[in-house]
């Protein structure tokens, strides 16, 4: 019976790296000493041997390959994209012995022998340019892991033998998305250590000079530059933290240089930016009538700070109460303070989201997105007969349907030819306060895209009242009233910062009770 260990002995004991055959069969705690304590205690010290572990399949195949070909690894072509990793072979169109300087896998990894075999690949410049970097990513991952140390021992004179002229197409995944993901993983593994020349890092962008010039070329610099350039430019969706070499910035085509000069030229940049003059929604409505117009014409930046200043000026004027008694005037001031506190709650988030923008280009992109969404929402409003108003997050109206214009007695020019806020159409202070409370609930954090509410919209004070005598009942009540109460549904469209960019409100009038009108 095994001796029961004390708690102190249990804490002090350490598991052995490999058990002996006796302890392994009896499931005993073995020690690192040979013979171990259990075998000495049972007088079988001469039989204490390390247990033979079952070898994995890939190690068995590697051992067989080592016995069959002491200097080379046989190369297979397989249609399965996983064959290079599972079978221990590397896909290629050639079955010749490979040089360790070429970055390919050979048996030097297993035998630790330094054997140099000349490369059989010809120096074909056109085929090197056509080589696809995607095809050699599997080889790169293996070679990077196995031969980083051996690559530093290769003389620079043998660097011309490092790039094969033909690449196998068997290592490509059938799915483009899976293949791109595999490339990203390969880039991460390859960049985890200092860069060493490998086939795919030099096959796509490298051009080998003529033979008489090979002695004067520093291939280490060439391979470092081409590897950095390939990983940065061929797959820009992943950032590997490369710094910009000064010579890479000069390798631009003439067209790229002209475009860059136009962007960086201050005189050209002034044409992209816009002046502080206000451009009404009626003007932009005529400029951007279709999606093609958005990309064909210059985008007019929208000045959100100016719009917020105009909104503040309107609110102060609306809640001033100059001609009201002191009690009502104080109530107006209290309502204004409530609104300003609601605006101040989400204002810092809006400012911080736009601080990191590259002005004016990011602002142009946001405005282009806004105009593109506005066209879609206007088409949507034309498909239904609900009275519709579309406004920005500042509250400025950018689109209004004919149905609500006829209900409220306004014209299109009177609304869109100047800066008109949705709050200007609201009849009472309660509707305005309720608007800002609802907007605060969706401005930050809450990503709900729809809101259901009630509000009162004011009719045009200068509307035609000549039809008052000819109307009776419900129509007369709607005509004589200075406002119409609506049930409204807001649909919130957000920008790339998840901030409300565009709000489409659909308004259904609440008919007064009486004269046979059923009220729910």
Curated annotation (Swiss-Prot):
Family membership noted in the UniProt record: Belongs to the ERT1/acuK family.
Organism classification: Eukaryota, Fungi, Dikarya, Ascomycota, Saccharomycotina
DNA-binding region: 20-48
Key words, A-Z: DNA-binding, Metal-binding, Nucleus, Transcription, Transcription regulation, Zinc
Domain PAS, chain residue ranges per copy: 376-445
GO MF annotation, one: zinc ion binding
UniProt biased composition (Polar residues): 90-104
Protein name: Glucose starvation modulator protein 1
Localisation: Nucleus
Function per UniProt: Transcription factor which regulates nonfermentable carbon utilization.
Superkingdom of origin: Eukaryota
PROSITE patterns xrefs: PAS, ZN2_CY6_FUNGAL_1, ZN2_CY6_FUNGAL_2
GO cellular component terms listed in the entry, alphabetical order: nucleus
Gene behind this protein: GSM1
Statement: the UniProt record of this protein carries the keyword Endoplasmic reticulum: no
Protein biosynthesis as UniProt keyword: no
Biased composition (Low complexity): 74-85
InterPro entries: ERT1_acuK_gluconeogen_tf, PAS, PAS_13, Zn2-C6_fun-type_DNA-bd_sf, Zn2Cys6_DnaBD
Annotated stretches, region: Disordered: 63-104, 194-213
Listed GO biological process terms: cellular response to starvation
Residues making up the signal peptide according to the UniProt record: none
Pfam family membership, one: Zn_clus
């Amino acid at each position: 019976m095994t001796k029961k260990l004390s708690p102190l002995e249990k804490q002090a004991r350490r598991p052995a790296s490999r058990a002996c055959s006796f302890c392994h069969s009896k499931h005993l705690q073995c020690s690192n000493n040979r013979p171990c304590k259990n075998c000495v205690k049972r007088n079988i010290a001469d039989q204490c041997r390390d247990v033979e572990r079952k070898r994995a399949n890939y190690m068995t195949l590697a051992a067989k390959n080592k016995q069959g070909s002491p200097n080379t690894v046989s190369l297979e072509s397989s249609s399965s994209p996983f064959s290079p990793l599972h079978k221990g072979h590397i896909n290629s169109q050639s079955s010749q012995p490979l040089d360790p300087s070429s970055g390919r896998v050979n048996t030097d990894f297993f035998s630790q022998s330094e054997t140099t075999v000349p490369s059989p690949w010809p120096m074909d410049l056109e085929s090197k340019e056509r080589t696809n970097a995607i095809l050699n990513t599997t080889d790169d991952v293996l070679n990077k892991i196995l031969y980083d140390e051996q690559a530093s021992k290769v003389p620079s004179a043998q660097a011309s033998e490092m790039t094969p002229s033909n690449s196998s197409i068997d290592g490509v995944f059938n799915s483009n998305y899976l293949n791109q993901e595999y490339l990203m993983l390969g880039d991460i593994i390859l960049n985890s250590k200092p860069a060493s020349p490998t086939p795919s890092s030099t096959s796509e962008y490298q051009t080998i000079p003529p033979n008489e010039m090979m002695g004067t070329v520093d291939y280490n610099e060439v391979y470092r530059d081409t590897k950095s350039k390939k990983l940065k430019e061929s797959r820009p969706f992943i950032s590997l933290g490369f710094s910009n070499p000064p010579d890479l910035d000069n390798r631009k085509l003439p067209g790229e240089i002209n475009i860059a000069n136009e962007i960086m030229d201050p005189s050209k940049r002034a044409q992209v930016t816009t002046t502080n003059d206000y451009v009404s929604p009626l003007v932009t409505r005529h400029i951007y009538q279709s999606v093609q117009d958005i990309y064909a014409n210059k985008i007019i930046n929208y000045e959100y700070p100016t719009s917020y200043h105009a909104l503040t000026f309107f609110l102060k004027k609306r809640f001033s109460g100059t001609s009201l008694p002191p009690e009502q005037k104080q109530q107006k001031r209290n309502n204004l303070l409530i609104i300003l506190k609601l605006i101040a709650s989400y204002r810092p988030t809006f400012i911080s989201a736009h601080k990191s923008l590259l002005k004016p280009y990011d602002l142009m992109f946001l405005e282009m997105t806004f105009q593109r969404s506005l066209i879609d929402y206007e088409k949507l409003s034309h498909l239904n007969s609900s009275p519709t108003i579309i406004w920005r997050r500042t509250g400025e109206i950018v689109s209004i349907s004919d149905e609500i214009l006829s209900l409220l007695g306004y014209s299109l020019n009177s609304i869109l030819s100047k800066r008109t806020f949705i709050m200007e159409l609201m009849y009472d202070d309660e509707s305005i306060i309720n608007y800002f409370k609802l907007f605060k609930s969706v401005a930050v954090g809450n990503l709900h895209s729809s809101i259901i509410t009630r509000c009162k919209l004011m009719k045009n004070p200068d509307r035609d009242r000549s039809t008052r005598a000819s109307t009776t009942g419900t129509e007369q009540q709607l005509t004589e009233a200075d406002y119409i109460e609506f049930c409204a549904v807001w649909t919130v469209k957000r920008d790339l910062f998840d901030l409300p960019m565009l709000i489409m409100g659909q308004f259904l009038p609440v008919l007064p009770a009486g004269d046979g009108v059923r009220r729910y």
